[in-house]
Amino acid sequence: MIRLHHVAQSRSFRTLWLLEEMGLEYDLKHWNFFDGSMRSPEFLAMSPAGRVPALEVDGRTLFESGAIAQYLCETRPEAGLAPMSGDAERAEFLEWLHFSETIGSLLANLTQHHIVLRDPAMRSETVMRLEAKRLEKCIGAIEAVVSGRDYMLARGFSAADIAVAYGMVIGRYFVDLAKFPAVSAYWERLQAREAFRVAVSKDGEAVIYKQAFYPPPEA
C-alpha cells in the first residue's frame, strides 16, 4: 500500500494529484502545520526537515515532491507521465519538473511575510514586492511555453505540468493570473482534468490561503 502524508494547500498536493493521474491506490494521512505534530519523532523519521510530502512506497519512505514525482514516473512508466531516459524531451521534462522548486521557494517567502509573520514589524514590504515580481517572472516563463502549445511538453500532459501548476494553485493568491492569458487558459485546462478535481476534493480544509494578497504593499 502507498501512503501519502499530506497537508492541505501545500506542495504535497502535487503528489496527491500525481497519484490520482496514475490511478494508483493509496492511503492519505492528513497532518497539521500548526499543532506541532510534524515535529514529532514519528514524522521526522519520515521527513527529517519536518515537511510534506512524505510518501511510503515500495518498502521505503521518500520526501521532496520533485524526487517523489521523478521516482514514481520512472518506476511506473506505464502511466505515460514522463519521457524516459534517452527520449528527446527528457531534459526539458527535468528542467520544468525542477523549475517548480524555484516557484516553491518564492511562494514560501511570500507566505511567510503575508501570513505566517503576524507581527507587522517582522514583515518586509520590500521582500513582498520583490518576491511577487520574481514570481511574475516565473509565471511569465510558463506563459512563453503555453502560448504555443497546450502543456509544458510538446508531447502533451506530463508530471511537469503537475509540478509547475503549483505556480497557479498557490501563486494565484500572490499574482493576478489575468495578466497572463495563456497561463490562465492553461490553468483552466488543468482544472478540468478529472484527476485534478478528485485531488482537490481530497486536499482538505483551506486553512492557509483564504484571500488574494496582490498587489503587494507600496513603498
Spell out what each predicted region is:
Residues C73, G167-M168, V200:
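Active-site-flanking alpha-helical
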Residues M1-R129, P217-E218:
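GST-like domain detector, emphasizing the conserved glutathione-binding G-site
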Residues S100-A192:
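GST-like fold's C-terminal all-alpha helical module
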Residues D203-A219:
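Acidic/histidine-enriched, glycine/proline-rich intrinsically disordered or flexible terminal extensions
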Residues A79-M84, L106-N109, Y151-R155, R197-K202, ...:
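Short, hydrophobic secondary-structure boundary micro-motifs
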Residues L19, L55, I68, I142, ...:
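Residue-level signal for nonpolar/aromatic packing positions in well-ordered secondary structure
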Residues F33-F34, A160, G204:
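Conserved beta-strand edge residues that scaffold enzyme active sites
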